[in-house]
Regions:
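Membrane-interface helix-loop junctions in multi-pass transporters/channels
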Residues: 1-130
Length: 130
């Protein structure tokens, strides 16, 4: 049960950090280049990979603390870090599967975003809900 609370607390910390970074990079208008998201995703990718592959955290760090750092803080801070870690892990074993996963992740994400956008626009125009 302790691990669930640690991950939850990490989630609060990670999402709060992401929000603070978005405030630091807010341009005052939308759309603008997503600098905050880029900063969060790139730093999260670095941090997750660093934490999981560093010998101390990999072999000696308490599993509850490791879960709080990775799943909690980094997981709520960004999901891109998880994607990049999985791509690296797949590349070590099966480059073809890594390419398929990467393409599915990118184009699947774009497709879901497009469908969400179109659905929201349709609802906003009264096409589904009146």
């Amino acid at each position: 049960m302790k691990i669930y609370f640690a991950v939850g607390l990490g989630g609060v910390i990670g999402s709060s950090l992401r929000y603070l970074i978005s405030l630091l990079f807010w341009s005052g208008s939308f759309p603008s280049f997503p600098t905050a998201t880029l900063v969060v995703n790139l730093s999260g990718a670095f941090l997750l990979t660093f934490i999981l592959f560093h010998p101390y955290t990999k072999f000696k760090l308490n599993p509850t603390i490791r879960a709080a750092l990775t799943t909690g803080i980094i997981g709520s801070y960004t999901t891109f870090s998880t994607i990049t870690l999985e791509v690296i892990m797949l590349a070590r074993e099966n480059i073809s599967l890594m390419i398929v996963y990467l393409l599915m992740t990118i184009f699947g994400g774009l497709l879901c975003s497009f469908v969400g956008y179109k659905t929201a626009r349709k609802i906003a125009k009264g096409g589904i809900v009146k």
